[in-house]
Amino acid sequence: MTVSTFNRTWAKVIVNALLRYGVKHFCIAPGSRSTPLTLEALQLQQNQQAQCHSHFDERGLGFFALGIAKVTNDPVAIIVTSGTAVANLYPAIIEASLTHHKLIVLSADRPPELIGCGANQAIPQQGIFADYPIAGVNLPKPAEHYNAGWLVATIEQACITQSQQGGVVHINAPFAEPLYEADENAINTHPWLKPIQSWLINPQTKWINSQTIQSEVSMHENWDYWRTKRGVIVVGKLPVEQGIGIKAWAETLGWCLITDVQSCVDANLPYADIWLSNNTVHQRLLQADIVIQFGGQIVSKRVNKFLEAFKGEFWQVDEYSDYLNPFAHHQTRFVAKAHHFLRVHPPLRQKPWLLEPLALSQFCAGFIEQQVGGSLNEASLAHHIEEVLATSGNLFIGNSLFVRLVDALCKLPEGYPVYTNRGASGIDGLIATMAGVAKGSGQPTVGIIGDISALHDLNSVSLLNKISHPCILFVINNSGGAIFDMLPVEAQAKEQFYRLSHNYEFAPIATMFGIEYIRPFTWADLKAKLKLAYGRKGVTIVEIKVNDQDGSNLYKSLVKQISQAEIA
């Protein structure tokens, strides 16, 4: 058998092993060295066992895969060639690692004899992602003296680790030339495959039968005591299914419930980022005996300040065993899904122990409406965000100023799926991630990002052409990085090195990539054009042009005024 044919046989085993662990999507960047992997992934697509996607920019491709992984909760494979193509995946690998989303990187490589000798496009790729992957496999160059069962077991073991912990797997796969003109008939019939033939022909069969570790959460030994006390519940980022029941549980206990925009939990005390600026309410909330936090990645600065200031009993509930303790609390940790925790901690019905947050939250609702006004701007879009969403769809929110405005000013419908990249909270790959969420879900998806974020990920506008159902990408154009208007930096330095003001508009970008584009000026105009956008196939870019400091100034003004409100 020729080298090119055995390369394909070797690659076939790799991609078929991934199928057994839920991989249904292969995201592929162009490249020659990865040809064996690419062609075998395409074979799976032809057999209707997987879908293949392509993109010319590995950085965007990584985030596109991340978006699919977020919405499907399945592992997604990424195939790239050797060299800097691999390195361009790093930002997406970091984000996926921090949020436990499942990516499997298949990086093709030069064979060992071409590393460290000046060969073209050959860099050391083993361990290139440092400690971010939860499993790393550095395969040898394909050779028949390796047992086929060994290759299957090696790939499956990495997938088993991922299935238990989430996160990223990196499989580095060297291939020697020639890479082309394989004998298609011989790929599937090589004697080397005989020991694994029954495994290969049955996609449901796993080589390693691993039993999942069962770790049921138990009721805290002092729960009967703590459920009679004064409590505060803080809900960070959670999957939709885990948030169900938290609101009713909190209301039964009579405890204050503070929810993050990523929680998918209906807020009975919305606008917490605003009303917690009031020191009187902040201090009274600190009188709680216990705080229970579900999930992490809290957006609100003032909610985080409350958590930092609280010195009482602190419980952290999260399905992963990560160390989530930025404020060094003396804490009790429950490695459990939120709804499993609720099931074994029955509430005791009590009257609310603190009414001021509810009163101030209700006041904020009317006050924010009054201050935001009827103009179409970033603050009003954040406050009325539910008016631009599809009934059954997804919301993807970018980083920087807008996610803070949404967290502070809006009240989302209970259980509406919200996606973000708040692991490392970077602005890279946001368009690509939104495209992945839309593609992976097949549901109408609204993405909202800032202008600098859009400029940072312009290549990924190309990915929007892969979406055939109605989706909306809002670009909030405040002519620069308005988030930095919040910083106490000298004006000239802020302008030149933080804000980076510009006069760019996004209509030419939409034209270049063949994407529908609208630029509304009023809410009536926006609603009329959105109705048309939701009635046609594909993505529409909506550019909202706003004055550069309006959003940040309103945000600061709301915080200041509520902080000074007199509380009886």
Curated annotation (Swiss-Prot):
One of its GO terms (molecular function) is 2-succinyl-5-enolpyruvyl-6-hydroxy-3-cyclohexene-1-carboxylic-acid synthase activity. NCBIfam families: menD. The lineage of its organism: Bacteria, Pseudomonadati, Pseudomonadota, Gammaproteobacteria, Pasteurellales. Keywords: Magnesium, Manganese, Menaquinone biosynthesis, Metal-binding, Thiamine pyrophosphate, Transferase. Its EC number is 2.2.1.9. InterPro entries: MenaQ_synth_MenD, MenD_middle, THDP-binding, Thiamin_PyroP_enz_TPP-bd_dom, TPP_enzyme_TPP-bd. GO terms for biological process: menaquinone biosynthetic process. Belongs to the TPP enzyme family. MenD subfamily. This is 2-succinyl-5-enolpyruvyl-6-hydroxy-3-cyclohexene-1-carboxylate synthase. Binds 1 thiamine pyrophosphate per subunit. It holds the Pfam family TPP_enzyme_N. Catalyzes the thiamine diphosphate-dependent decarboxylation of 2-oxoglutarate and the subsequent addition of the resulting succinic semialdehyde-thiamine pyrophosphate anion to isochorismate to yield 2-succinyl-5-enolpyruvyl-6-hydroxy-3-cyclohexene-1-carboxylate (SEPHCHC). It comes from Actinobacillus pleuropneumoniae serotype 3 (strain JL03). Homodimer. Its cofactor is Mg(2+); Mn(2+); thiamine diphosphate. It catalyses: isochorismate + 2-oxoglutarate + H(+) = 5-enolpyruvoyl-6-hydroxy-2-succinyl-cyclohex-3-ene-1-carboxylate + CO2. Pathway: Quinol/quinone metabolism; 1,4-dihydroxy-2-naphthoate biosynthesis; 1,4-dihydroxy-2-naphthoate from chorismate: step 2/7; Quinol/quinone metabolism; menaquinone biosynthesis.
